[in-house]
Amino acid sequence: MSKILGRLVSRLNQIRRLKESRKYITVNEYFSQVKSIIFTNSRHLKEENKKFGKLNGDITFYVIRRTPPGAGLFSNYLLVLMHLKYAELNSLTPIIDYKNYSNYYSGKSNSTSENYWDNYWDQPTEYNLDEVYKSSNVILSSANISKLLEKNYGYYDLNSKKFLENQRQINDFNGISNSIKLRRSVKEKVNNDLKSIFASKQNILGISLRGTDYLNTNLAKGHYKPLNIDEAILLTEKKLVEWKMDYVFVCTEVKEYIELYVERFGEKALFLKRQRFSNSQSEKFITQYRFRRNNDSFETGLEYLREVYL
């Protein structure tokens, strides 16, 4: 009886959490996930084998997708890297599809949706989605491949401590990451940022600080707790001396952190000028907050991408 009750509670909790994302996904996606929770105790997409048409009979395509509405830009990116490794290990031809699955960057999926991936990065193949969805051998990916990668191939989840302690796997995935090229227009913006922010400056320490939804223990389950701002500044002071650095580049979505770094380090504090959030905006996932500007979802993703690449 207790096991049955536990399963029921688990399903009800998942449906409750799904309701929080309801306005970011389509009606069909919502009820499909509710159905999946009821029958499988998981809302996430499962791997499927499909035959959509007669094209490319000698190729097996691997469509990389994520359960709508997905997550933040680099959470999605890391998931794609793991799927690309799986495709490589199984001699599959990968393509990333964020057009037919609702997400925070291109909105609810519809007939006019863009594949937001193509706004930031090139595809890992010369084929396009239209051709793939007319082909005879297509695998639609599961939402997350990390457990299968570890169980069958010994590759660790990119978010895990075990991965960060394995230099061979770091090098392996670094190679995969380098094969994913920034879209030319984005690359040009990054190069301009490099020139305008760093110019001829040398000996620059980089620090990445998360706040906002990472400070909410209910939203950040499964994530490591970030340094608080006092800890970060103390560590920065120590490393500037220890590593003989002249500047510190601060990568963060939190405007208060930038202000405190400028207050403490003055002109030694370097940063990308962009829209940032307040730490008080921690009641929802950061991807659910919006700035009042045209095409904000794309612009916020682009600013984050440029900052991380610096």
Model-assigned labels for residue ranges:
Residues M1-R22:
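Boundary detector for helix-to-coil junctions that initiate low-complexity/charged tails
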